[in-house]
Regions:
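C-terminal motif of bacterial Sec signal peptides marking the signal peptidase cleavage site
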Residues: 16-20
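Bacterial signal peptide processing site
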Residues: 22-25
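Flexible, processing/modification-adjacent segments and terminal tails
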Residues: 27-31, 35, 84-134
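Short, surface-exposed charged micro-motifs
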Residues: 49-52, 72-74, 135-139, 149
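Gly/Pro-enriched, hydrophobic low-complexity segments
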Residues: 61-66, 117-172
Length: 172
């Protein structure tokens, strides 16, 4: 009888521990790193089509497809410098030399910010905040937490994210 009681007790503990596995908040936690997507961006007067990749380590790349004048350019950001790559050549700029209004810096500031609690709306899970004195609104899919759109009005930045998926390292 003692062994049965121990068995039942152990089973209850195991079930209790398993109930917590994989639990998510109802809105899904916002995913601001560790994802890749296609980004349709309106930045000032420029319309941009690019592939945005944010690694789990916090670095970011923006690979431009449009406008044609930027096609093939890849901007990288790791928090300490920005890299510009084109045709196998690469140039690194220290963070203090990168203008505050640079697209990659603006994206990195918003996606790298600590996000306060958001609000569920018809658009999705909306996170409003401020970084470097600029207000932003980041909309995430309520089920997955993956970004859907971003607005930074003061910078003239409006972005829509599609084909969004969790980041997979090429070496995996």
């Amino acid at each position: 009888m003692k062994y049965r009681l121990q068995y039942v007790f152990a089973l209850l503990i195991a079930l209790t521990l398993l109930c917590g596995c994989g639990a998510k908040s109802p809105a899904g936690d916002p995913v601001t790193e560790g994802f890749s997507c296609r980004a349709a961006i309106r930045y000032g007067e420029m319309d941009i089509d690019a592939r945005l990749t944010c690694t789990p380590e916090g670095s970011m790349t923006v690979a431009f497809a449009l406008p044609k004048s930027l096609s093939g350019v890849v901007l990288g950001w790791n928090g300490t410098d920005m890299t510009l790559e084109l045709g196998g050549m690469s140039l690194a700029l220290p963070v203090e030399k990168v203008p505050e209004s640079a697209l990659v810096r603006c994206l990195a500031q918003v996606l790298g910010a600590t996000h306060p609690t958001g609000t569920r709306t018809e658009e999705g899970y909306v996170i409003s905040g401020e970084t470097e004195g600029k207000a932003y609104a980041l909309v995430c899919d309520p089920a997955t937490g993956l970004p859907v759109s971003l607005s930074v009005p003061e910078e003239g930045l409006e972005a829509t994210f599609t084909e969004t998926q969790l980041y997979k390292n090429a070496t995996e």
